[in-house]
Amino acid sequence: MFNQGLSLEQAPPIDVPFRFFITAPLFAILISIVILSNDSSLIMNRYSNIAISVVHLFTLGVLSMVIIGAMQQMMPVLAGAVIKRPKIFATIIHLFLSFGTLFFSFYFIFDIKYFLNFATIYLAIGFFSFFIFSMVLLFKVKFVTPTVKAMRIFTIVGIITICLGLYLSMSHINLNITQYHYNIVNIHILFGIFGFALIIIMGVSFQVIPMFYVAKNFPKFIENKLPILLVSCLILFSIIELL
């Protein structure tokens, strides 16, 4: 193995990412409780309240928690984007995401509207704080690698995904389900899976896979163009979906 391009001395304290990593399994346990406590027909119906709760317990409580925790370690080490007060930053993001996810899932389980109000505020603060702050740091990086480019795209797509989620959340709060609501749902899902999750995995793989001698370096075209091509496909799908 080699550490070319890594800034290991800039890694944050281990408890910064670990608080996110430890929280993720707790949400996974909560998912299993919800699944075991409800009829399978509700779980299989993608538009049922229980299914929406389970999906977001995973995407917000497990997937996002792990990605955001890892990003706070990867940004300083892989990109050289140093968070000056990592413990304070991590604490704020972790608290807002944790409580926001709980309120969001509880709204769909118990149908208490105030929970969705709190969830929308908490998740908006948590996600926007993380993505905007990360974007500013990443766009200040001078030595731009394909991984840094992918991280930049990840923050932009993350903001789009959250904006779509906020639109859907506000639709439920205001009881204003428009004719485009389910089209926005489909776009939100694709941006979450192929934008938020896949792009960051792809970007980190550009550096980590060759680093551990799993495979040779990716072709430059793949490293530089594939994330942009993926986002272009997402935008094209969104336009077609709304027509």
Model region roles, listed by residue range:
Residues 1-243:
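Hydrophobic alpha-helical transmembrane segments of multi-pass integral membrane proteins
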